[in-house]
Regions:
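HKD-type phospholipase D/PLD-like phosphodiesterase module
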Residues: 1-21, 27-168, 195-269, 276
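Class I S-adenosylmethionine-dependent transferase superfamily signal
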Residues: 40, 187-190
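Long, repeat-rich segments with strong aromatic
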Residues: 177-179, 184-188
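Charge-patterned, long linear interaction tracts outside catalytic cores
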Residues: 278-287
Length: 287
């Protein structure tokens, strides 16, 4: 199942939590949305064993209140110490129970579900759930993960090659991303693909990224800016003819090689078409 925000709102997240029966593992960059916190609180009252793990120092943010509110739910709570270093983050956005996993682009705050373009994907694939469970348990316990990763998952550190394979797939690709950044392998792949690439970024993009835009435009990459008052592009997606990517990864060196990030590759034609249609609608609203 694919959910598109802000249209879908917070309901899919709350529903996922409400459906948990025995346990629920949540790993997000930060969590402050009240309906989600309330759903967690009710899940614990039902007897669900809830574990929540967040980043310890999200960029330009204090988590003092966030930590307090999460602990008040009664959930088991940890800062991801494996990625609690300078300029390194636990930027993942996923949760899972014993039979379902949700992977997406949204931080669990009010803006994600009311103002942002975000995508969330749910799956019942047992192998994907098993991989995510092992990753979560390792990070939660502060142990380096060295296990098997399902081939449909895009997990950082070490996600560069899978992102390059998304860019290099035959045919045109459509990208929505909050930022670009100077990471030569990604920029070279985009430049090489040239006019077969369309990219939507928020109009509030940094001056540094504006230089990257000018570089890519020299290679005929088509780039448009989405006015922030319309919808804020926080999503990270790559949509092609054969497959699509949704995940937490930005296309930067740190995101792909240092952070904990989680994404998913989708091969379902119906969902790919849904993503394409949303991109085309967004493209028409850009400048």
């Amino acid at each position: 199942m694919l959910y598109i925000m802000p249209n879908a709102g917070v309901i899919p997240i709350v529903r996922f939590i409400n459906n948990a029966k025995r346990d629920l593992d949540v790993n997000v960059y930060y969590l402050s949305d009240k309906p989600i916190l309330n759903a967690v609180r009710y899940a614990i009252k039902r007897g669900v064993d809830v574990k929540i793990m967040i980043d310890g120092k999200p960029y330009r943010m204090s988590i003092r209140k966030e930590k307090r509110e999460i602990k008040r739910t009664g959930a088991h709570f940890e800062i991801d110490k494996m990625f609690d270093r300078k300029y390194v983050f636990d930027h993942a956005k996923y949760m899972l129970d014993n039979h379902e996993a949700l992977i997406g682009t949204a931080n669990f705050d009010w803006s994600a579900f009311h103002k942002n373009r975000e995508y969330e994907y749910t799956t019942y694939n047992k192998n994907i759930i098993s991989s995510l469970k092992n990753i979560f348990n390792s990070d939660y316990s502060g142990v380096k993960f060295n296990g098997h990763i399902n081939h449909n998952l895009v997990v950082s550190p070490g996600a560069t090659q899978k992102i390059l394979s998304m860019i290099d797939q035959p045919g045109s690709i459509d990208i929505e991303t909050e930022e670009l950044g100077y990471y030569r392998p990604i920029l070279s792949a985009l430049a090489k693909k040239g006019s077969a690439v369309k990219i939507i970024v928020p109009s509030s993009i940094s001056n540094y990224d504006k230089k990257i835009i000018r570089f890519l435009e020299k290679y005929r990459v088509k780039i448009r800016l989405m006015p922030a008052r319309t919808v804020y592009i926080h999503a990270k997606t790559i949509v092609g003819r054969q497959k699509a990517f949704i995940g937490s990864e930005n296309f930067t060196y740190t995101s792909l090689n240092k952070n904990r990030e989680v994404g998913i590759i989708i091969y379902n034609d119906q969902l790919i078409n849904k993503l394409k249609n949303q991109f085309n609608n967004d493209w028409a609203r850009c400048r």
